[in-house]
Amino acid sequence: MAGCLVTGNEDGAHSCVAHVLWAMQEFGFTIPPNVNAYWVNKAGPGKSYIEAGGERYLYTNKTLFNTIYNLIFFAKLLKQHPIDTNLLELKELAKQESEPEE
């Protein structure tokens, strides 16, 4: 199970989240929907998250709560219904449907 929390502004945060979550799923993590949160502030230098009162910022808190609750929900779901995929069996099925490799 994985989610992503980053600091930064809109475009940079989206790019970071996309790369991190893609990499995590490549390692076998389950990625539920809407499991990223970031702080949106004015672009450029300025106050830090804490100095600007970021912990009271509605958008950040909304996406953070979405992230937390979706991660918890899917963790419970996977605990009750584990994914029992056998990758070796799937590889053999794929071989049967494929042209022989040279």
Task: Show the residue positions of the predicted features.
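Glycine-rich phosphate/pyrophosphate-binding loop and the adjoining helix
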Residues: Q25-E102
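Helix-loop-strand module that forms the ligand-binding subsite of alpha/beta enzymes
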Residues: M1-F27
